[in-house]
Amino acid sequence: MVHSKTKTSFYRRIYVTWLIQQGVNTVPKIIEATDMPRRTAQDTLAAIHELEIDLENNNGSYRVRDWGAVNANWVNKNINQIKAVLEYP
């Protein structure tokens, strides 16, 4: 199934935020977990704030301070669907 760029962009941002919450909190760890290109990982991290998600960056190690406009419980319940849409492991 083909998904819109809007949907995949949104899912990618919340998935990376979820990964950070799970301890996959550096660009190399995100790349290893997802196989996404480095630039995609960096661009995703740079765009997460557009969802009002508050990340702290401490020398390349990220931490979620606030999920903002995103319901973290919904993400936790639907993480397998999110990964399937993005075709990530």
Predicted regions and their residues:
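Long, low-complexity, charge-rich intrinsically disordered regions
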Residues: 1-5, 19, 66-89
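Short capping segments at the starts of secondary-structure elements
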Residues: 21-26
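Residue-level detection of the helix-turn-helix DNA-binding "recognition helix"
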Residues: 45-50
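Short, leucine-enriched amphipathic alpha-helices that occur as contiguous helical runs
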Residues: 9-16
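The alpha-helix within a helix-turn-helix
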Residues: 30-32
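Minor-groove-contacting beta-hairpin "wing" of winged helix-turn-helix DNA-binding domains
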Residues: 59-67
